[in-house]
Structure formats: structure tokens, C-alpha cells
Amino acid sequence: MSNLPFTVAALYCFAPLPQYESLREPLAQLCCANGIKGTLLLAAEGINGTVAGSAGAIEKLIAHITAIPGLGEPELKYSHASEMPFHRMKVRLKREIVTMGVEGIDPLKSVGTYIAPKDWNALIADENTVVVDKRNDYEYAIGTFEGAIDPQTRTFREFPEWVKQNRDRLEGKKIAMFCTGGIRCEKATAFVKGLGFDDVYHLKGGILKYLEEVPREQSMWNGECFVFDERVAVGHGLAESDVELCRACRRPLTPQDKLSQFFEEGVSCAGCYAERTPEDRARYAERQKQVKLAEKRGANKHIGS
């Protein structure tokens, strides 16, 4: 039981939701009435999101979601935060709850074999296993599993093309995929199986469940796990980390990254310095100055973030 004040719930569920548009307003009202912040995505294929609030408020929300006709029990990962990790509450209607951009991919019909965190090490240590990090390049940069391939994708939409271009690396192998909470692997494994690969596996509950359940001394995870909120990243035991965001490009930065000559708080980092013009950096510097002034006044410290 954590003594941190905010409970963070990452959830998803694939299920036919033809009535998804009508679910938006009740969810938004419940969240706002109970001080919950974060993002929930609704689509005809299900629900996905990460939210934070008091333990009691999150319990109410999960009960509401579970009671939605046709939805069933969502895949859930809980963690905790010392501060509210979101700025506002958003409930959005989408075409997909995780955007791959490939028509006809349905994890309810075909999906990879789930591997529990306690069994994951044995699978990825097998010399006949290819381990694929299903996340984006900036996520891979601060942490991944031993021996994992980085597809060097900036978005999930790029993954299908990577698979097609790298079939020879996957042929005749066990294919083990992982992502933050599991949802990207639902579609990724369904896609790969649709190409004719049979031995396709994914980490049940994702990295978050692995870091929660597998002791550090037994872990094959190196680094931190990027999360899409103001905590930026978590480590073993889902403890908050010292990774921060570059407010110019949203890349995660380790303490080592901040030693770069190209790092300036709120203005640039080594990853984005060459991508921005002097005018851009001047604009970011002015924004950062306003952030600092707001902090001194006790106003919202996330202005411009």
C-alpha cells in the first residue's frame, strides 16, 4: 500500500462498443466531479487511457467503466505519484484506441501468446528468441530489456513497415514483443500473426507490470520506463525517477543528458538543438522566463508545457 497521495491507473480493453460516442459525457462528468485528471480514449474497438486521482475516486471510475455494457474487465496497472501527474481531464472520441493505421487488425480475433512477468526472463534469454521493443525511439533511449531490438520508430504507425522490411530477422524465431502497458502489443502481435508468423509472444501487462512484480535483483530490465505523464519515467517497483522532459521537444532526459552543452532548460537538448532555429530557441527562452515568473508568483508551474 503506497502512502503517496495520487493513484495512477493505466487501463485498456478491446471490446465492440458501437455506443462509444454516448459514453463520453458520463465519463467526463464522473471524472470532473471526483477530481480525476488524465486522458481516456473511446472508439468502436474499446477504451484506453491513463488517469490519476485519489484512491477512492479511481475506484469509482473503474467501477463505472467495468459496468459499461459489452466492455468487461479492463486490463489495469496501478502506480502512485507524489503530485498530480496530469494537468486536465480529457475524454476523446477516436477511430482507434491505439493508432496503428492498418485496417482489419482485431486483437479479439487473433493475438500473440501472453507471457506473465515471472516467465518473461526465460523467454527473452532463449537464443532462438528475437526481442522487439514495440515502443518509440525516445522511449527506448532511456530503458529497455537486455538484447531488445530498437525498431527506431517515432510513432506506432511506422511499425508495420518496419516488420515488412525486417522479415528476415524474424523468420524461424520466437518473436517476443513488449511495450509500456500492453496495448500496443495487442495490435502489433495481431498484425505480425496476420503476416504468417506463428511463434509470437507479448509481455502481459507490459513493462509496468514487470517492474511491479519482478524483483530488481532478478530483473533483465535496464534503465527507466517512459510514461506519458508528468512523472516522465518510473523504475523498479514503479518508483518515480529522476528523468525529466525537454520542454522544447518532449524527449525524456536523464541527468547525464542534461550535462550536454546543447541543454538549456525549457529551450533545447542535444536531441532537438539542430532541429530548431535560433528564432525557435528565442521563443522557447521567453516562454521559460514566463514559467519561472509564474512559479515565483505561485501560479501554474506548467505554463507552456
Swiss-Prot record:
Residue stretches making up the Rhodanese domain: 125-219
Record carries keyword Oxidoreductase: yes
Record keyword Metal-binding present: no
Active site as annotated: C179
Domain of life of the native organism: Bacteria
Alphabetic keyword roster: Oxidoreductase, tRNA processing
InterPro entries: Rhodanese-like_dom, Rhodanese-like_dom_sf, TrhO, TRHO_N
Pfam families, alphabetized: Rhodanese, UPF0176_N
Molecular function terms from GO: oxidoreductase activity, acting on paired donors, with incorporation or reduction of molecular oxygen
Documented EC number(s): 1.14.-.-
Top-level enzyme category: oxidoreductase
Catalyzed reactions: uridine(34) in tRNA + AH2 + O2 = 5-hydroxyuridine(34) in tRNA + A + H2O
Function as written in the Swiss-Prot or TrEMBL entry: Catalyzes oxygen-dependent 5-hydroxyuridine (ho5U) modification at position 34 in tRNAs.
Family: Belongs to the TrhO family.
Matching HAMAP family: TrhO (MF_00469)
Identification of the protein by name: tRNA uridine(34) hydroxylase
